[in-house]
Amino acid sequence: MTQLSSNDVPSMGRRQFMNLLTFGTATGVALGALYPVANYFMPLRAGGGGGGTSAKDELGNPVTKTGWLATHQAGDRSLVQGLKGDPTYLIVNEGGEIGEFGLNAICTHLGCVVPWDSGANKFICPCHGSQYDTNGKVVRGPAPLSLALAHVDIEDDAVLVKQWSETDFRTNENPWWA
């Protein structure tokens, strides 16, 4: 058996450093991979005790009631970023106030964003022609289901979008999206 010279054997300090570097790198990668999973199950909430998500405009700024009503008239249906970042329609009712519900703008057929057609007074999907009435109820397929509902609340002038889990008032059935 041959003996290695002391120059060929790495010092304990260098070995410990390499072990620490390897462990630190592996830990960093593992924690980085777990962050999106943890964020999915425990999403960040908007300020306030209600637990809603702050509606955001096309620039990512929080929507306020006074700012929204200053630029949107009665009957308007315009997109904001709502729950889970999905495009959501805020509805200004005929009384000039923001409605108590919003509509998720994702078509229930293939997931296209459904634009509001003010001339036809309904939502018409550009992908396959599904149509939804003013409240998001499907009136013409191939979409099988109505647009998902979301609660819209005003807290200190901030517009909050919250999960809808009650009976769907359009169909009197349990919500398919909850």
From Swiss-Prot:
Job description of the protein: Component of the cytochrome b6-f complex, which mediates electron transfer between photosystem II (PSII) and photosystem I (PSI), cyclic electron flow around PSI, and state transitions.
Keywords of this entry: 2Fe-2S, Disulfide bond, Electron transport, Iron, Iron-sulfur, Membrane, Metal-binding, Thylakoid, Translocase, Transmembrane, Transmembrane helix, Transport
Cited NCBIfam families: Cytb6fFeSPetC, PRK13474.1
Native source organism of the sequence: Prochlorococcus marinus (strain MIT 9312)
EC number: 7.1.1.6
Boundaries of every Rieske domain copy: 65-161
Protein location: Cellular thylakoid membrane
Domain of life of the organism encoding this protein: Bacteria
Binding sites annotated in the UniProt record for [2Fe-2S] cluster: 107, 109, 125, 128
PANTHER family listed in its UniProt record: CYTOCHROME B-C1 COMPLEX SUBUNIT RIESKE, MITOCHONDRIAL
Miscellaneous note of the record: The Rieske iron-sulfur protein is a high potential 2Fe-2S protein.
Cysteine pairings via disulfide bonds: 112-127
Details of cofactor binding: Binds 1 [2Fe-2S] cluster per subunit.
Membrane-topology annotation of the record: Single-pass membrane protein
Recorded GO CC terms: plasma membrane-derived thylakoid membrane
A Pfam family it matches: TM_PetC
Ranges that cross the membrane: 20-42
Family of the protein in this entry: Belongs to the Rieske iron-sulfur protein family.
Any one Gene Ontology molecular-function term assigned to this protein's record: 2 iron, 2 sulfur cluster binding
Protein name, entry field: Cytochrome b6-f complex iron-sulfur subunit
Cofactor(s) annotated in UniProt: [2Fe-2S] cluster
UniProt catalytic activity: 2 oxidized [plastocyanin] + a plastoquinol + 2 H(+)(in) = 2 reduced [plastocyanin] + a plastoquinone + 4 H(+)(out)
Subunit description: The 4 large subunits of the cytochrome b6-f complex are cytochrome b6, subunit IV (17 kDa polypeptide, PetD), cytochrome f and the Rieske protein, while the 4 small subunits are PetG, PetL, PetM and PetN. The complex functions as a dimer.
